[in-house]
Every structure is written in structure tokens, then in C-alpha cells.
């Protein structure tokens, strides 16, 4: 069975 993987959390860009 194909398991749906939730999208990764948004990455915050630190400058």
C-alpha cells in the first residue's frame, strides 16, 4: 500500500 507522506514543514531562512 502506498503511504502518503505529508509535506515537510516550511523552512525558515535566517540571514
UniProtKB/Swiss-Prot annotation:
Cellular component GO terms held in the UniProt record: extracellular region
4-hydroxyproline: residues carrying this PTM: 6-10
UniProt keyword annotation of Secreted present: yes
Keyword terms: Cell wall, Hydroxylation, Secreted
Secreted in keyword set: yes
Domain of life where this protein originates: Eukaryota
Protein localization: Secreted, Cell wall
Protein name listed in UniProt: 200 kDa cell wall protein
